[in-house]
Amino acid sequence: MSNRWRFVVVVTLFTYCLTFERVSTWLIRSGEPVQHPAEFPFIAFLTTERTMCTGSLVSTRAVLTAGHCVCSPLPVIRVSFLTLRNGDQQGIHHQPSGVKVAPGYMPSCMSARQRRPIAQTLSGFDIAIVMLAQMVNLQSGIRVISLPQPSDIPPPGTGVFIVGYGRDDNDRDPSRKNGGILKKGRATIMECRHATNGNPICVKAGQNFGQLPAPGDSGGPLLPSLQGPVLGVVSHGVTLPNLPDIIVEYASVARMLDFVRSNI
């Protein structure tokens, strides 16, 4: 098999796995567990009956996440804030009232909902808004994270922060390997050296950290600092023949601002 076709097959498999029922998302591999919920008061934990995703509160009634997180045949049934782990009784829980998927991602969304293979990756458009049935109470400690400016697209070499509830096969604690634990990490922006759709932001593990998003982190934010703004949303991972590690593609929020602003 040629390198070109091997690349197409690998990308297709990654995308299909991330949108299927049992593996809907991407982990902060080798990440550091967050010790206090107030460190990321804007982070949301999205769950269906079988899967989980990460999101960011961008208005008092809207959570920004990945399109593939809401395109599963299983709907999101709960959105939790100020929670460090799955099942945390101290968190604040909300019910979703609806979702808005970016138009550019709808071909992949329809395929996922109908359980059909994804024809092509649309990671640059992989953005959705989950609307909440009730406004969050900002007096509770939950915070809204700011959106970027249209020019806020980080250049290659930029150090960034990543946050999410994903699984971590590198965690020495067996109870934390399957995800549902909020972790943070560092990574680096790189030039996308492969064919993409929607002009995503490509991210590689930081040279001294080895941390990347993984299943469960999908929809999680790409941050220039721990306070924001949210520059990107985790879409999916890609393996390239010349690189030893996975490259993670993020949908650029700056490039999707019109959609986001009109739906929050």
UniProtKB/Swiss-Prot annotation:
Report, as the record phrases it, the tissue specificity of this protein. Answer: Acetabular (penetration) glands.
Using the record, list the residue span of the signal peptide; answer none if the entry has no such feature: 1-19
Give the GO molecular function terms: serine-type endopeptidase activity
Checking Pfam families in the record gives:
Trypsin
Query: What SUPFAM superfamilies does this protein map onto?
Result: Trypsin-like serine proteases (SSF50494)
The alphabetized list of GO BP terms reads:
proteolysis
What positions does the domain Peptidase S1 occupy? 28-264
The UniProt keywords, alphabetically, are: Disulfide bond, Hydrolase, Protease, Serine protease, Signal, Zymogen
What the entry lists under SMART domains is as follows:
Tryp_SPc (SM00020)
Matching PROSITE patterns, A to Z?
TRYPSIN_DOM, TRYPSIN_HIS
- Active site as annotated: 68 (charge relay system), 126 (charge relay system), 218 (charge relay system)
Record-annotated disulphide pairs: 53-69, 192-202
- EC numbers listed for it are 3.4.21.-
Describe activation and inhibition of this protein. Activated by an autocatalytic mechanism.
Residues that make up the propeptide are 20-27
Q: What does this protein do?
A: This protease cleaves elastin and thus facilitates penetration of schistosome parasite larvae through elastin-rich tissue of the host.
Family to which the UniProt record says this protein belongs? Belongs to the peptidase S1 family.
The protein's name is: Cercarial protease
Q: Could you tell me which species this protein originates from? A: Schistosoma mansoni (Blood fluke)
